Amino acid sequence: MLFSAALIVRNEEKFLESCLLSIRGLVDEIIVVDTGSTDRTQAIALEQGAKLHEFKWKHDFAAARNHALDLARGKWILYIDADERVHPADAARFREKLLDPSFVAHSVQLHPRLGSTAYPELRIFRNDPLIRFCGRIHENIWPGINLYRSQRGGRIGTSELVLSHEGYEGDQYHKHRRNLPLLRMALKEDPGRVFSWCHLANIYTALGKERQGMKAWKRVLNIVRKKKNPRSEDSLPFIGMIRWKLRHNQNALALINEAIRRFPANLQLHWLHGKILMDAGHFKEAIGVFEHVLSSAKSGQYDHAIAYDKRLLDVFPLSELATCYFKLQDYGKSGLYFEQALQIDSSNLEYRVKRALCSKLEISVEIQQEPSP
């Protein structure tokens, strides 16, 4: 058997069927490990031909994931969540890649939320006892991959598979309350894990605990600042702390400048820089920043290792450029940028009204500038 899919689930009747249908023609077996569902999750798994197993929940996502890996018989494993989908792909061509003995793992292109760009994430790896997850929450396969490679070698490849995440809809309150104690335990076990600190800060914010959120952002910023070789995702604490400062009307200019020095290819940081300048009334400086965001997006010269809101690559900087030129009373250029924004988001009433206003104001200025007879 070549290829297995491994899932852990609990009360996923809303998402599971679509997930299993999306991978059924790609893999040879589907392992579903249920950690205590009380809805139709188990029935759906069986209806779709999955091999269903139960696992007592131990407040440890890695333990559940590793149990699923223990049950898989394929030479390769895809790990996927119930609220994710694999987009149609050339299954035969992809499976041919798995026959290459020089590879130990492959990344997929993951869209983490609706309307986001994709980023590479390691989801496919050899079925080997050395390769196991670690981490009570936000479980991580990289330590297992690195252990395998240190003993046996192997390359990391990129696949054509595209996954999209369909979750994060509706009220997340109960999920946040569930994850909060797990994150606290995980950070006691691994206090240097950047992603866990970011998640903790975001949960505190979502639960209205702004002060605790700020403390978490400060803690993780200190961790990142000590890194000799920061990764792309290490920009997230800067973004989180900058947004916290902006929400509380605090000056974030020094922090944004530091962040851009450390992560010059991160478009979200540049966009936030432009917003800060614009809000401070520095419209000419902001124009240069938003033009940089647009040109970088068009040329593809930015950090693709993290996901962005797709609007940040076009309509957001266009609308901010339009606003800057409006504030500078250059209604002609402002109207042109609102028109470009409308071409992307044709249903946006605000852009339509402001474009019309720019046209009227431009005519008014021209009339005032005409010489008297």
Where are these regions (language model features)?
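A conserved acidic beta->alpha catalytic loop
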Residues: 22, 26, 34-46, 57
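Conserved donor nucleotide-binding strand/loop of the catalytic core
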Residues: 42-67, 71
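N-proximal low-complexity "stem/linker" segments adjacent to membrane-targeting elements
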Residues: 1-22
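Catalytic-site signature of metal-activated, phosphate-bearing donor transferases
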Residues: 63-69, 75, 80, 86-215, ...
